[in-house]
Regions:
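Beta-strand elements of repeat-based all-beta scaffolds
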Residues: 196-197, 234-237, 307-311, 422, ...
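Ser/Thr/Pro-rich, low-complexity mucin-like regions
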Residues: 211, 241, 311-323, 397-407, ...
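Long, intrinsically disordered, low-complexity, charged/polar and glycine-rich segments
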Residues: 1-233, 239-242, 264-271, 276-301, ...
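Outer-membrane beta-barrel pore domains and translocons
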Residues: 37-39, 250-252, 503, 783, ...
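Short, solvent-exposed beta-strand-terminating loops
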Residues: 252-259, 324, 440-448, 886-900, ...
Length: 988
């Protein structure tokens, strides 16, 4: 079950990286882990907790999520007019100067001013973020219509308009959701339903399908809004050998109605605008609107889907859920939040910045909700129609009668449910994790929680009758600490305890992204300050303390000593002046305005220097480590890493300076040095890391905004347009060298490792220079690189995006080649690549050397059936869909496998039966000089027995979790002898 208590911390952000492994499911050599992770930054009022409770996330598969920029990329109306970037990306071609940029925006803007023919379009690609199975990144559509990926890996995006989109009729007929009473259908007639991503090992990951696609629509003004596909869950994994893992989802409740949720919050705003006299600073012929009360609510109606079944060649995983019985109640509060769900048109005529919100829009998409009766009755029906699901159990069943195992969850009864325990059981044994949280609660009613300027709880509830100050709301440590994870108790009885403190900073990035401002304060949530590990008897094992400064002695000083850099100070007011200085709009918001930046992973606060001190059980220091990171400020190599200004601008004067930038967040948060000090403060070791950019061109990203302001005094309507073109960097910032220096009483010893990379972001070379000053290097060539000249299997590998297999490794000492190891590849009849031979040479021209491994035949999965290794001929018998070797015979006559190829290939594609083992025994008798190993497996494909060439058999017993319980054998008289027994004792 792993090592308990060793909780890593992402010290650049101060966030503990907490993960509880559940189990792994497999398909051949592919492993899909299932676990629960906890993220401290997600302890906030919005949105509602996930299926594992507040701040916990179920890690099982993955997803692609979309940030819509302007129109959804695929937006198309029932008359066939496409609004989105998907069919207008070519409008960006030819933008090579500011004048051509302004011209492109002006042409586009004209379609907004005269939309009688519905000719509007946009120049902004949506942003698609993916996170699955250890892979993460983003992708965008570029001006050529290609999907461009921003990731540390070379990941390929596949999308087909015919296979990955549906129209409104198909969406309705599928039963995925009900569009009852929706009046904006004609403007929404195309929806993206999925993508396929291919990783460098050739694995294909399919996302979406209607059951695995989540949708959303603004909760208010639903009548005139777009229905948007926002999330595509992982639905199938296909390995390069053709094995599949399928993931199924549920989107309907027990009443066979589409599951609905809402994410509502109170976010009042105000707007004042009019014609501006720059001589005296006055406004005229304008208007003022304050959106408080009912008009201050914002949010979305959500159409979620939940992972229900995972099927592999070996296991079936079933996830069961139950509705949170108190969810509806937390959406209702008399006189306040209750009005966030519904109000009647006769009660209030609501409009927000000129958009009329009819009362009957509240029933759109609400199949099964009766609109008759009192307002209170209708609100209660709407609340009851919402469902917030929580995970109850995850059960894994073996496909081969190996039994079952499950994880059972327990939750608190607080307003925002907390995961309190995980029980692991297989019907015979069980063990538990338990979790405790800091005391106190956020507001019970979801829409009414008050937040600071970073979205964290202040501990109060909003008062909707008040006019906000629209100013910075500071963070409160007491409020932020409430409901945070304080303790994990492991199955052994040991514990890990967490203490937190507010994030601090001594510098902040300017809004223009050109420089840093000396300014200190607290901001943006919590960081871990201390982690205490306790033994089962409660005594302290060790303590880890974290200091976010340059020296431990600085930790007790003022905020100015903090190494934190604030990415931006939240801005609550925008003063927007037209370029001719004749029109002014002043917009204020309780929630801070966000800067539209693509490919941005900047934390609220990042730390340039963090010290981690370890304290032993006796309270004495065991030493500490100081880690430095690249950040906005200057790193140890004199290099700063700020964002950069837009390439082109067409903007109004914005005194708040909120403007898009080109993000360089991919350069920040890289560890630049680690210094290890002993208990007395002496430096024992120092490791320095340098980085460089990989190849890859930036893609242009346009941000534009069109604003229409209705004025008075006969002045008509003011039209304002703003836009910027920034760059989205595809290149990455990889480690190019590591210099490690160890200090001992006899002197210092240094080793330097240098690295280069391919265009595919795979390693190109690694060079190590030791204390003897000699370079020892390895240079790598990959099979896909041989495709243009060698064709055949290499072309197939390149086409399937199988990039990682090596074709050659050349080892050098200085400039002299020491040896070269090569691999050749072929493909099966079904197109599965496999290693067909390996050779070792003493020169780079491949003239001096020999082939030392050759595959003579394979099964359909590319597993070798007959190989020659250093003149030794071996036969290999595979089974269980090519996942397990059930027999190996060494020193057999050449061609033996070919004589039995039909049986061997058939055996590989199915599970073995007793007659298969009988055939192996007969084969062993036919070749008395051969050395046979025979393997049996249990229902979980764990080893059951191993028979070695002398006929001795060792037996193994595992539990359903794959833990070895016993090793034993039988003697010639049939007596059973135990070799080893293993007991797993847990405290509870």
């Amino acid at each position: 079950m792993g090592t308990y208590g060793n909780i890593p911390v992402g010290v650049f952000t101060g966030i503990p990286e907490i993960n509880i492994p559940f189990f792994e499911v497999t398909a051949g050599n592919y492993t899909l882990p299932i676990s629960a992770s906890y993220h401290l930054a997600n302890v906030r009022p919005f949105p509602t907790p996930g299926v594992l409770g507040l701040a916990w996330n179920l890690e099982a598969g993955g997803h692609i999520t979309r940030t819509v920029r302007g129109f959804p990329d695929e937006k198309k109306d029932s008359q066939g007019h496409a609004y989105g970037f998907l069919e207008h990306h070519s409008e960006m071609n030819g933008i090579s100067s500011r004048s051509s940029f302004v011209s492109a925006l002006s042409t586009m803007f004209e379609t907004f001013m005269d939309n009688t023919g519905h000719n509007e379009y946009e120049l902004m690609s949506d942003e698609y973020s993916f996170c699955f199975c250890g892979h993460s990144g983003r992708f965008y559509l570029d001006e050529s219509g290609n999907w461009v990926v921003v990731s540390d890996e070379d990941i390929k995006v596949l999308f087909s308009m015919s296979d990955n989109t549906v129209n409104l009729s198909q969406l309705e007929q599928s039963g995925r959701l009900s569009t009852v009473w929706w009046t904006n259908k004609s403007q929404n007639d195309r929806f993206i339903t999925g993508f396929t991503l291919v990783t460098p090992d050739g694995c294909r990951y399919d996302f979406g399908g209607l059951e695995a696609t989540e949708f959303s629509i603004p909760y208010y003004n639903r009548a005139n809004s777009n229905l948007v596909a926002t999330t595509w869950h992982l639905s199938k994994i296909t390995t390069s050998e053709g094995r599949e893992i399928t993931l199924s989802y549920k989107y309907k409740g027990n009443n066979d109605r589409t599951l609905l949720m809402c994410d509502l919050r109170y976010s009042p705003q105000s707007m004042q605008y009019g014609y501006y006299n720059s001589n005296n600073g006055t406004m005229s012929d304008g208007a003022y609107q304050l959106n408080i009360g009912w008009n201050g609510f914002m949010g979305f109606l959500l159409f979620p889907s939940y992972l229900s079944v995972i099927t592999t060649p070996n296991e079936t995983v079933r996830l069961s859920y139950r509705p949170d019985a108190t969810y509806a109640n937390r959406l209702l509060q008399e006189n306040y939040a209750i009005h966030a769900l519904y109000w009647s048109e006769t009660t209030v005529t609501a409009s927000r910045f000129g958009d009329f919100i009819p009362a009957n829009q509240f029933l759109m998409f609400m199949d099964g909700v009766n609109g008759d009766g009192t307002q209170t009755e209708i609100r209660q029906r709407i609340a009851a129609r919402m469902s917030d699901m929580r995970l109850d159990t995850i059960t894994v069943c073996s496909m081969r009668g190996g039994g079952w195992k499950k994880v059972i969850t327990s939750f608190s009864n607080l307003a925002r449910r907390h995961l309190t325990s995980l029980t692991f059981s297989d019907g015979f044994h069980s063990h538990h994790y338990s979790f405790k949280y800091n005391a106190g609660e956020m507001s019970y009613y979801y829409p009414m929680a008050a937040t600071d300027s970073w979205g964290y709880s202040t501990g109060d509830s909003v008062i909707i009758s008040e006019t906000p100050t629209f100013q910075l709301v500071p963070s409160s440590q007491q409020a932020l600490t409430r409901e945070t994870l304080s303790e994990i108790t492991y199955p052994t009885g040991g514990k890990t305890c967490f203490e937190y403190e507010l994030n601090t900073y001594s510098k902040r990035a300017s809004y223009s992204a050109t420089h840093l401002i000396s300014s200190n304060g607290v901001a943006g949530g919590l960081r871990v300050s201390r982690i205490t590990n306790r033994r089962g008897d409660g005594s302290i094992d060790n303590i880890r303390r974290f200091f976010y400064c340059e020296n431990i002695s600085d930790s007790a000083s003022t905020l100015a000593a903090s190494s934190g850099v604030l990415s931006q100070l939240p801005m609550h007011t925008r003063n927007i002046l037209s370029s001719d200085r004749n029109f002014l709009a002043i917009i204020k918001s309780k929630d801070a305005f966000s800067v539209p930046v693509t490919a941005d992973d900047t934390p609220v606060v990042g730390y340039s220097s963090v010290i981690e001190q370890t304290i032993g059980s006796d309270g004495s220091s065991l030493g500490w480590v100081r880690r430095r990171f690249s950040n906005f400020d200057t790193d140890i190599y004199g290099q700063a890493h700020p964002d950069t200004q837009p390439v082109y601008r067409l903007v109004m004067s914005d005194s708040s300076q909120i403007s898009p930038v080109t993000s360089l967040s991919y350069e920040r948060g890289k560890i630049t040095s680690e210094e290890f000090f002993d208990a007395t403060g002496n430096l024992a070791r120092k490791t320095c890391h340098r980085y460089g950019h990989t190849s890859g061109n930036a893609i242009p990203s346009i941000h534009h905004e069109e604003s229409f302001y209705h004025t008075y005094g006969g002045m008509g309507t003011a039209y304002l347009q703003t836009g910027c073109m920034t760059s989205t960097h595809v290149r990455r910032y990889f480690e190019t060298s590591v210099e490690d220096t160890v200090t001992t009483p006899s002197g210092r010893y240094s080793t330097k490792t240098s690295k280069t990379y391919k265009v595919s972001k795979l390693p190109k070379s690694v060079t190590v220079k030791g204390s003897d000053s000699k370079d020892r290097s390895e240079a790598y060539t990959y099979a896909y690189e041989r495709a243009p000249t060698w064709g055949g299997a290499y072309t197939i590998m390149a086409e399937k995006h199988i990039l990682t297999p090596l074709e050659s490794v050349t080892r050098l000492v200085g400039s002299q080649t020491r040896d070269m190891e090569t691999a050749a590849y072929s493909v099966t009849a079904g197109g599965v690549p496999y290693t067909s031979s390996c050779s070792l040479y003493q020169d780079s021209q491949r003239t001096i050397g020999k082939e030392h491994y050759k595959v003579l035949s394979t099964d359909g999965y590319g597993n070798p059936l007959e190989v020659v290794a250093d003149s030794l001929v071996s036969l290999l018998a595979w089974s269980y869909q090519g996942q397990r070797l059930i027999a190996r015979a060494d020193n057999i006559p050449l061609g033996t496998a070919m004589q039995h190829v039909q049986w061997l290939t058939g055996l590989s594609s199915r599970d073995p039966v007793p007659s298969d083992y009988e055939a192996i025994i007969q084969l062993r008798a036919s070749f008395p000089n051969a050395l046979f190993h025979i393997y049996h497996y249990d229902g979980w494909l764990c080893p059951l027995s191993v028979t070695v060439p002398n006929g001795h058999t060792t037996y193994y017993k595992h539990d359903n979790w794959g833990r070895l319980l016993e090793e034993y054998y039988y003697d010639a008289d049939g007596a059973r002898h135990v070799l080893n027994q293993y007991d797993y004792h847990y405290a509870y």
